Amino acid sequence: MPPRFNDSWYYPDDIAHDLDGVEGLSEALKQEAYACAWEYTRCVIPQYTNWDRYVAFMRTIIIGIIAEFRGELVDVAASDSIMGCYSLSAVLDALFEGTPGRELMVREYKTFLLVTSEKTSKRRDSELFRRYVNGLAASPRSWFRMRDCDALARFSLAAALACNDMYDVFPTDEQFELLTEIGDTLYDAVAFYKHRSEGETNNTFAYVPADMRIQAFRVAREMLWALDVAYAHKPEGAILVNFIRFFGGPIHMMMRRYRFVEEDLTVGKPETAAVVAETRRNFKLWNRVDAQVAAPGQTSSDNSSDNRSSSISSTSSTGTDGSGAGDASSVHSSGVHSDATSIEPEKEDQSSVFEAPGADRFRSLLARSKELMFPELRAYLSRSGEPHCNRCLYRSSYGAQQIHRFGGVELCRGCRAMWRGYVESLPERVQEAFPDVVLKAPPPPSPRRAVPADGEADSAAGQRSKRLREDLTAAGEYTTVAETVPAEDVPRSAPDIMEDVLQAECAIDDMRSAVAVF
């Protein structure tokens, strides 16, 4: 077990009593939530000119933190009053009033609360959440838009501009898409094991092939620095890029919500059973999304879809990839083998026979989409009543079924390949959305040096030996240097060392490519 530390929590007095009177939360949890909101705000919006807006942003983070592990306390659809201590409209007005995009950001935040509280409450088997998770896997572009909202990414970017009194600058939708995709790719690559310990449905590499995680992080990081250079002299540049920079990795070391100290100053350790157990107890304010087991006596119509998915699970669980998600390529979502001649009757059966609990509530929420959902979400949910692919693994109720597994849809090989291509196209899409960005081609790999045959003189080593003797005698020191110096005793120049490093990296890339083939 990792060591436990008695943390002292620091946060400004402005938020120190926000949760007074809220039942169901201990005083220790309240203080940790205040400190977490302060630390996150300081990390992702390190500079500000408007303290009142800054405090309002902290309050949105406090509410969000509670929603992430005690969803039953936050019901944005029921009332403007959140937990009896916040007027949501007042908080959002304090943050965005008079700024461009205000109405869009209000809908963005309400969507986050609606879906997040659904995931962390007893309503996780609802029709809303089932369709939401189905929609996550529909396509890479819709995934990144939904993940953007789930991470409050564009919301925080807009808040960062507001907190710096920048009212004449607002990214386009396309620019928001790319900025948040870069940030979410970086964050999810680092948070891979954290999210897996939580049984998350929302991690990029639960859908993008996990063997791309390191390469995707590397490329996204390059795009971050390309944007940083392109917008270095624009006032909004540092504000927007700083959010991505800190959100994409450093917060895992600086915020106490993560396990950097508890895990020996490391980032990215695979989760253990002990970590999962702590997650269930909300240690570090984490939350475990376990698959829900059907209650005894449940009717066949209630669990018909679970029966279909369980047959797939038993078939596909024999093979898993690095993402912790099973490969569902050999079967349809109904458990029928992929060589079946017709899938249309099956799809009709899935949409007409099964409907999760809370269907009426889902329809009423959909009718309020202009109030409670970001603009694209209504369409995503409407077309997610049935599977988008008959070879991917869909379920009626989502959550991790065992340790080292994510909790969402498990994509088939064909869909994973399509997602791979989308992620690989990131640099081209960044250049289209941000014309000022100038992409650079990486330098060509150095040619491999031939290994001298036995008895063959190494001319480069001889030259280094000669240079060393000349340098030493010219300085008036070590004049008794022997006429020849063994090559292995001669200090190597920096260019020679770097050349060997590049060759080693090429060899490693070759080995990775070979492994990927198999």
Swiss-Prot record:
Known EC number: 4.2.3.-
Region described as Disordered: spans on this chain: 294-355, 440-466
Signal peptide (from-to): none
Domain of life: Eukaryota
Pathway where this protein functions: Hormone biosynthesis
Assigned keywords, A-Z: Lyase, Virulence
Biased composition (Low complexity): 299-339
Gene Ontology MF, one: lyase activity
Family statement: Belongs to the alpha-ionylideneethane synthase family.
Function recorded in the entry: Alpha-ionylideneethane synthase involved in the biosynthesis of abscisic acid (ABA), a phytohormone that acts antagonistically toward salicylic acid (SA), jasmonic acid (JA) and ethylene (ETH) signaling, to impede plant defense responses. During pathogen-host interaction, ABA plays a dual role in disease severity by increasing plant susceptibility and accelerating pathogenesis in the fungus itself.
Designated name of the protein: Alpha-ionylideneethane synthase abl3
Organism lineage string: Eukaryota, Fungi, Dikarya, Ascomycota, Pezizomycotina
Gene expressing this chain: ABA3
